[in-house]
Amino acid sequence: MAAVDSSVSGVSGRYATALFELAREDKSIDAVKADLDRFDAMLADSPELARLVRSPVFSADTQAKALAAVLDKAGFGGTTAKFLKVLTANRRLFAVTEVIRAFRALVARFKGEVTAEVTVAETLNKKNLDALTTALKSVTGKDITLNVKVDPSIIGGLVVKLGSRMVDSSLRTKLNSIKHAMKEAG
């Protein structure tokens, strides 16, 4: 990995890289990714779990016991459960969402995929998602994974971030451009 990817730098990048290498050796990359995606969804759905993970108020012992109970109840095992327990023991559980993001980036790079961060004003239907994926694939020549975020403040259009490139065709940006042009003219 000669090229440094900003999405896998820092503490979270080191943990993600270690987990990725371990999963690659075990030939369990897809299983670990699925587990991490599920854990990420659990964090999004449970404010209590998110608080346990992110709050420094909980002691290491309390955090470890609570996480072990959550992992057991949710049916996590193997590499992912051990990894999350290591994060907890090292007092780095607060960084788990960044670790998951970095792990996803490593998996995408390994599979030759490119992840596009797409911001839209309203949820896109499958037809529009497929059309966007096809258009981006024709530009990059690689498989595309879309991470879609809905942000009504862009009013309309979309913002696409693909690596270091960004295309902002949002209505908000166009209106701001017109507003600035009118201020300069008048």
From Swiss-Prot:
It is a peripheral membrane protein. GO terms for cellular component: plasma membrane; proton-transporting ATP synthase complex. One of its GO terms (molecular function) is proton-transporting ATP synthase activity, rotational mechanism. Pfam families: OSCP. The keyword Protein biosynthesis does not apply. The keyword Acetylation does not apply. PROSITE patterns: ATPASE_DELTA (PS00389). Keywords: ATP synthesis, Cell inner membrane, Cell membrane, CF(1), Hydrogen ion transport, Ion transport, Membrane, Transport. InterPro entries: ATP_synth_OSCP/delta_N_sf, ATPase_OSCP/d_CS, ATPase_OSCP/dsu. Its main location: membrane. It is found in: Cell inner membrane. F-type ATPases have 2 components, F(1) - the catalytic core - and F(0) - the membrane proton channel. F(1) has five subunits: alpha(3), beta(3), gamma(1), delta(1), epsilon(1). F(0) has three main subunits: a(1), b(2) and c(10-14). The alpha and beta chains form an alternating ring which encloses part of the gamma chain. F(1) is attached to F(0) by a central stalk formed by the gamma and epsilon chains, while a peripheral stalk is formed by the delta and b chains. Belongs to the ATPase delta chain family. F(1)F(0) ATP synthase produces ATP from ADP in the presence of a proton or sodium gradient. F-type ATPases consist of two structural domains, F(1) containing the extramembraneous catalytic core and F(0) containing the membrane proton channel, linked together by a central stalk and a peripheral stalk. During catalysis, ATP synthesis in the catalytic domain of F(1) is coupled via a rotary mechanism of the central stalk subunits to proton translocation. PANTHER family: ATP SYNTHASE DELTA CHAIN (PTHR11910). HAMAP family: ATP_synth_delta_bact (MF_01416). This is ATP synthase subunit delta. It comes from Nitrobacter hamburgensis (strain DSM 10229 / NCIMB 13809 / X14). The gene is atpH.
